């Protein structure tokens, strides 16, 4: 049985395009794990089909900056002229529901969270870095999405190269050959770290 009193938090880390979102969809279907995705707050405009409070918490830049000043974020970052951040209140809400929060963050955000909370015994961190099968495959996945210009793809790839250098900062590393295989490996890691 999963020990919910440990206040486990899963940090799922990896470069953009590595498949974290697809892996999460599989993990959230698990009857064994009681996972909930921590929704981030953002100042970016809502995309078609997105719902406030479901996909993100869409807030104004002023409100976001006020939350920064009040130390309401576990971490926050500016990405392509928009703020993104993980609200501590969202994590506490997930705990109150008897579930394990999953934070899908880039390396920079993960490092900020771990720096801020590493000496606090409040949380049991399960840090997992998702690797692409190869750098070329990562680029192919980003291109196939069809959502970015060549310039944005180049920026994402340069950022991914930097993020891959930090992979050893995380306790577990898995390679996403297929989302099913990666999700199975991650489920085993989470079960091992949360039992007892």
Swiss-Prot record:
For this protein, the parts annotated as crossing the membrane are: none
Per the record, the domain of life is Bacteria
Ordered alphabetically, the record's keywords are: ATP-binding, Cytoplasm, Kinase, Nucleotide-binding, Transferase
Cellular component, GO, one term: cytosol
Instruction: Extract the GO molecular function terms from the UniProt entry.
Output: ATP binding; guanylate kinase activity
Which Gene3D superfamilies does the annotation name? P-loop containing nucleotide triphosphate hydrolases
Sum up the protein's function in the record's words: Essential for recycling GMP and indirectly, cGMP.
Similarity comment: family membership:
Belongs to the guanylate kinase family.
Q: What is this protein called?
A: Guanylate kinase
The organism named in the record is Mycoplasmopsis pulmonis (strain UAB CTIP)
Gene name, Swiss-Prot/TrEMBL:
gmk
């Amino acid at each position: 049985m999963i020990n919910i009193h440990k206040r486990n938090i899963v940090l799922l880390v990896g470069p953009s395009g590595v498949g974290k979102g697809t892996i999460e969809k599989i993990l959230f279907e698990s009857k064994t794990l009681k996972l909930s995705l921590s929704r981030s707050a953002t100042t970016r405009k809502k995309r078609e089909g997105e719902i406030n409070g479901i996909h993100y918490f869409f807030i104004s830049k002023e409100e976001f900056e006020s939350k920064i000043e009040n130390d309401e974020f576990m971490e926050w970052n500016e990405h392509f002229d928009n703020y993104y951040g993980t609200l501590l209140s969202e994590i506490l809400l997930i705990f109150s529901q008897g579930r394990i929060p999953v934070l899908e963050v880039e390396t920079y955000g993960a490092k900020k969270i771990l720096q801020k909370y590493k000496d606090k015994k409040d949380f049991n961190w399960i840090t997992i870095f998702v690797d692409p099968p190869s750098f070329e495959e990562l680029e192919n996945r980003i291109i196939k999405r069809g959502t970015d210009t060549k310039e944005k793809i180049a920026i994402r790839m340069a950022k991914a190269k930097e993020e891959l250098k930090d992979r050893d900062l995380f306790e577990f590393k898995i390679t996403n050959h297929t989302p099913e295989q990666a999700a199975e490996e991650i489920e085993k890691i989470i079960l091992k770290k949360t039992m007892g």
